[in-house]
């Protein structure tokens, strides 16, 4: 399949290139011993070094911009090796990031994330909050969320901390 793929960073956005294949290969190889009993970590290192040398790099943008609607133009495309694009025009679904955005919030928060309403779904437990603390800038808590960190009743959305990793807003509109 490698011969049929475009060179890294030469394909149109959201189309797999050789770096995507190398990344997948490295992940399979690093886990080979678990599934086959054969240690292929040396082969995984070769594949991941191909990815590292492919031209993709850590984007020099705020971490949250990796998860916004315009991550194909806001600098995130420097880092994202194989995105799955949902643009709302050519690809519509109730899958993709729809659940991830809607379930993370209630209605007032949903509006700030560029959606019409929230589903009041998932939240994180106290143990997660304690493991990362409040100082890690990659953890995006819902602003103003003063709900208790402990969850005693999993049917109550007002318990546990809410995270908002994904947003339907673009970097330039927020």
What label would you give each PLM region?
Residues 13, 57-174:
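Elongated scaffold/linker segments in the mid-to-C-terminal portions of large proteins
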């Amino acid at each position: 399949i490698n011969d049929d793929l475009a060179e890294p960073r030469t394909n149109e956005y959201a189309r797999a290139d050789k770096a995507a294949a190398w990344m997948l290969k490295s992940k399979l190889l690093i886990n080979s011993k678990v599934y086959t009993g054969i240690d292929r970590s040396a082969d995984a290192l070769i594949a991941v070094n191909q990815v590292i040398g492919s031209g993709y790099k850590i984007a020099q943008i705020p971490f949250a911009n990796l998860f916004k609607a315009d991550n194909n133009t806001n600098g995130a495309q420097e880092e994202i090796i194989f995105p799955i694009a949902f643009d709302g025009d050519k690809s519509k679904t109730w899958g993709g990031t729809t659940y991830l955005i809607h379930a993370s919030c209630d209605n007032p928060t949903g509006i700030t994330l560029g959606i019409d309403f929230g589903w009041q779904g998932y939240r994180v437990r106290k143990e997660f909050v304690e493991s990362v603390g409040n100082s890690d800038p990659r953890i995006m808590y819902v602003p103003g969320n003063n709900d208790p960190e402990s969850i005693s009743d999993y049917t109550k959305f007002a318990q546990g901390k809410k995270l908002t990793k994904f947003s339907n807003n673009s970097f330039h509109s927020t």
